[in-house]
A protein has these predicted regions:
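Glycine-centered hinge/linker elements that transmit conformational signals in sensory
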Residues: 177-181, 220-253
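C-terminal capping/gating helix-and-loop segments adjacent to ligand/active sites or protein-protein/ligand interfaces
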Residues: 307, 373-427
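Short, solvent-exposed loop/beta-turn-alpha elements that line the ligand-binding surface or hinge
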Residues: 112-125, 168-170, 210-236, 284-285, ...
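Extracytoplasmic/periplasmic solute-binding protein
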Residues: 135-144, 149, 159, 174-225
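Hinge/lid segment of periplasmic solute-binding proteins
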Residues: 95-150, 176, 203-207, 291-293, ...
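Short, well-ordered beta-strand elements
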Residues: 29-40, 61-66, 90-91, 140, ...
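Extracytoplasmic/periplasmic substrate-recognition and gating elements
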Residues: 56-57, 64, 79, 161, ...
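Extracytoplasmic "Venus flytrap"/periplasmic binding protein-like
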Residues: 53-125, 160-162, 261-263, 270-271, ...
Length: 440
C-alpha cells in the first residue's frame, strides 16, 4: 500500500505538470537531446516520469531518455562513441567509479562551468555529496542516484535475543557483542554478515578517517599510489574482517551482495551492512520489522564518515553550445527540491538538494518511514574532507575485484592480514601506474 500511495503522488505530479504546460510547438522546433542512463525496473520508471514531466513543463527542449543496460554497458558504449567521435549523448549517467575516466576523457564539460552564467546556486547540493565529483575545486558532474552503506538489523531478532531493538551497535566491537547474544540465545543462526565487497573496504577506511590513495585521495593531484598500506588503515580493516569471521557468530556468503541480503531477509542473519539503495525494498518487503543504524566504525574518529556511491549526470562536449546549454537546463531541473523529493520517494536514493527534505510530501514520507531519516542523518553527519570524498582513481573497479579475490584467502588462513594489505597495495599500485601511463 505504501508503494501505491507514493507512486500516486509521483504520477499526480506528472499529470499536474502536463495540464499546466503551455501549448507545445511542433517537435521539429524543439531542441531534441539524448540522455543515456542505466536505471532499469522501478527506478527507470520513476526516471522516465521525471523526463516526461520536464518535457511537459516547457516547449523548447525534448529529452529522449535511452536505457543502455548496466553501468558497465553504459561506459562501454560511451567509450565507443568517444572513439568514433560520433553518437555521443548530450547527457550521460555514469557510476561513481567511472568518475576518473570521465574526468580524463576530455569529452565532458564540467557542470560548474554552467553555474555562473545561469545563476545556479552551488550550495543547493549538499557538499558532502558534491565533493565526490569535485576535482581541484571544480565540480565536474551533478550527483544523481546517491547512496551510502548502512547497518540493517532485524528488530524481531533483537527482541528475541534480549537486545534493545531501538539501539543498534555503533562499532564493530558492539556488533560482535550483539552477534554473540543473537546466536547464543537462538534468536537467529548467524549474528552478523557482510558481503565481500571492495566498496565496503573503502567505506571502512573512510570511517577510520584515512585515505585510500595518496595526494588527498587524488583530489589535489592524480593518485600515484595507495595510502592504506602506509597509514595503517588497510591493516585495521583486514584485521577487523578476520576477527568477525573467526568469532563464530559470522557467516560469509561470498561476493554476491544479493546472497547476503537473502540470508538477512529470510531471518538467518540478525545484522548486515548494505547500501541505502535497497532500503525502500527492505522496508516494504521484509516479513519482519527492519531497523537501521549508521555504518559501524572500527574506531570512533571525528574525521571519519561515509562516502557516497551510485552515479551522476555528465554533460558531454558535443561541440554544440546551444545543445549543451539546453542539456544543462534539464540537469538543473532534476536538482530542484520537488523533483528530488519525487526521485527519493520513488527510488530510495538520497535527495541531493537539502530543501527537498523540507517539502510537505517528503516530510510526510519521512514521518512514515523513519529508517530513511537514519540514512539521511548519517550522510549529514559525515564531515566534508578528502577521506569522505572517496578516492578518485581510474582503476577502482579493478581494485575492488582484487580485494574480493584476496579477502577469502584471509578467511581461510592462506594469507595473513599483513600479507593481504601488501598484495592488495602492490596490485592496485601497478594498475594505477599502468592507467596513468595510458593517459599521458
Amino acid at each position: 500500500m505504501k508503494n501505491k500511495k507514493w507512486m500516486a503522488i509521483l504520477l499526480g505530479g506528472i499529470m499536474a505538470a502536463s495540464l499546466a504546460a503551455p501549448c507545445s510547438v511542433s517537435a521539429a522546433e524543439k531542441t531534441t537531446l539524448t540522455f543515456w542512463h542505466a536505471m532499469g525496473g522501478t527506478n527507470g520508471e520513476v526516471l522516465q516520469q521525471i523526463v516526461d514531466d520536464f518535457n511537459a513543463s516547457q516547449d523548447e527542449i525534448e529529452i529522449k531518455a535511452e536505457y543502455q543496460g548496466t553501468y558497465d554497458d553504459t561506459i562501454t558504449k560511451l567509450k565507443a562513441a568517444m572513439q568514433s567521435d560520433s553518437g555521443l549523448p548530450d547527457v550521460c549517467q555514469m557510476y561513481d567509479v567511472g568518475t576518473k575516466f570521465m574526468y580524463d576523457s576530455g569529452a565532458v564539460i564540467p557542470v560548474e562551468d554552467k553555474f555562473e552564467s545561469t545563476g545556479y546556486d552551488k550550495s543547493s547540493v549538499m557538499e558532502v555529496i558534491s565533493s565526490y565529483y569535485t576535482v581541484d575545486g571544480k565540480q565536474y558532474a551533478m550527483p544523481f542516484n546517491v547512496s551510502t552503506p548502512m547497518l540493517y538489523y532485524n528488530k524481531d531478532v533483537f527482541e528475541a535475543a534480549g537486545l534493545d531493538p531501538e539501539t543498534p551497535p555503533t562499532t564493530y566491537d558492539e556488533v560482535l557483542e550483539d552477534a554473540k547474544k543473537i546466536v547464543e540465545s537462538g534468536a537467529a543462526p548467524v549474528g552478523y554478515s557482510q558481503a565481500i565487497y571492495g566498496w565496503f573496504f573503502e567505506q571502512q577506511l573512510a570511517g577510520l578517517g584515512v585515505t585510500y590513495g595518496n595526494n588527498d585521495n587524488g583530489r589535489t593531484e592524480a593518485v600515484t599510489a595507495v595510502d592504506f598500506d602506509s597509514n595503517g588503515g588497510g591493516l585495521k580493516v583486514f584485521d577487523m574482517w578476520k576477527k568477525l569471521y573467526d568469532s563464530g557468530y559470522f557467516e560469509d556468503y561470498g561476493t554476491t551482495t544479493a546472497d547476503t541480503q537473502t540470508a538477512f531477509f529470510s531471518g538467518q542473519v540478525g545484522m548486515i551492512i548494505e547500501s541505502t539503495a535497497i532500503l525502500k525494498n527492505a522496508v516494504d518487503s521484509s516479513p519482519f520489522e527492519v531497523g537501521t543504524g549508521y555504518l559501524p566504525r572500527i574506531e570512533q574518529n571525528d574525521e571519519g564518515g561515509v562516502i557516497i556511491g551510485g552515479g551522476s549526470l555528465w554533460l558531454t562536449d558535443t561541440g554544440n553550445e546551444a545543445n549543451e546549454d539546453a542539456a544543462w537546463k534539464f540537469i538543473e531541473y532534476i536538482t530542484t527540491p520537488d523533483v528530488q523529493a519525487k526521485w527519493s520517494m520513488g527510488t530510495g536514493y538520497f535527495a541531493i538538494n537539502e530543501k527537498a527534505y523540507e517539502t510537505d510530501d517528503m516530510k510526510a514520507y519521512l514521518e512514515e518511514n523513519p529508517n530513511f531519516e537514519t540514512a539521511i542523518n548519517q550522510l549529514k553527519d559525515s564531515p566534508v574532507n578528502c577521506n569522505t570524498a572517496g578516492v578518485l582513481s581510474g582503476v577502482q573497479t579493478e581494485a575492488r575485484l582484487t580485494f574480493n579475490e584476496i579477502m577469502p584467502q584471509v578467511y581461510d588462513g592462506k594469507l595473513t592480514t599483513q600479507d593481504a594489505v601488501d598484495q592488495l597495495a602492490a596490485s592496485v599500485n601497478k594498475a594505477i601506474e599502468n592507467y596513468n601511463e595510458s593517459i599521458k
